[in-house]
């Protein structure tokens, strides 16, 4: 969509009453309305007499509902159609109508031709919109260098949107060598002319130090000015600063208000952030269904991150009914836009056959594409896929792939890498390093890592033997649903290792394991019940114990793996 803001708007009178009841009874307003009607009649009469400027002004009045005229795009188009063939302003506005479908069927090719005719007279707004045509390939062959030339000519004519668009080209290095300082300069020129988009973009430069010295306070002021003018991108950026507490006091409620304001203004990214707020319960009551609705609205606005997030909601049934087919379709849309997480999730669909026909080779290709874009989740999934193959080389590659995700703190990768080092799968067997990896994953709450680390402490493999720490780890893993951890904990209660012997507690844990189908749980349950039915045995003398808590001893030992030669 090209720029179509009116270049002449009647300034709002700050004395105009806003209350409709006051409007009815205010003599001052009635006088003002009379003056506007008379002014409109004067312009209409001049237009009918062939005054080119009056014709354009009447069209603008009808297009935007200003100057006392009712908003009527059809009438606006008819007025613009009466402009002279050599009037640049009239040709430009007629192009705007065709470009946006104002009062006429949309025709981008005809709009481009009209911009070309208007630009021949060096009319700055037409030069700018023609630049947009060349930048996007709308009505002409795409040519970024030509777009830059046209934006530059519009900027030299003092047109703020031309300056702003030229800045964008410098910012991204499109059609011209990338130059953040020149980009910021262009934005600053247009911002001085109070163009909200330029104020926002200059704010971005100030927030992140792109082309100017980083200055969050200045960014905040620019965002506020643009947001006050109703620019949704700035409202959203201001919301992010409030959410982060960056330059302002952290205030999630204010962030949500700004996200909602920007979303209602049609900004897809704001819908996405509003969805995250509902999903996480920040600044608003947590509501998965409302989060999904926001993600869907952002996805319908073609915001790529939300396209992937909507797929996740369908895949896991989070806020929406689980639907693998729809999930795969959204992941496909995201992958087509080179979104690495969407590629990974589409790969998972192909690997599992969820929503698509199973195709492991295609899954591998998607994981590798995502990994090439720096997606660690894709790298982890590729490692998991390779581990399921039979050949040793695949297992060696899997172990190599797990190193980076584990190093940056991904608990699943740390756990799986620990399994590799514990079993010697794809790497040299190193029990101590395996225990270290389990430690790191367990500290982040990974239940399988807690279980494996508990076994290390129970058996003394890879670390010092400490049944009390083992019991604590089994308990934490069991609380997260690990049935095997329940049975391992039951064994410690049965034998009185690391905990006080308690056959009733052991019975409860073995019973839960039996219901879950854990191998050996039924035999252990029968054994404990037999022991409970037998006469009580004499209790052994108490042994001295380490008075430190199991968790404290666990943390004391988390100092990295010792050398294993």
Question: Where are the predicted features?
Answer:
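Terminal, low-structured helical/coil segments at or just beyond the last alpha-helical repeat
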Residues: 7, 520-565
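Canonical positions in the second alpha-helix
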Residues: 46, 82-83, 117-118, 153-154, ...
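Short helix-capping/linker turns of helical repeat alpha-solenoids
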Residues: 48-51, 64-66, 85-88, 100-102, ...
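Canonical tetratricopeptide repeat
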Residues: 55, 91, 105, 127, ...
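Hydrophobic face of amphipathic alpha-helices that form TPR/SEL1-like repeat modules
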Residues: 57-64, 69, 91-100, 114, ...
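TPR/TPR-like (Sel1-like) alpha-helical repeat modules
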Residues: 370, 501-519, 526
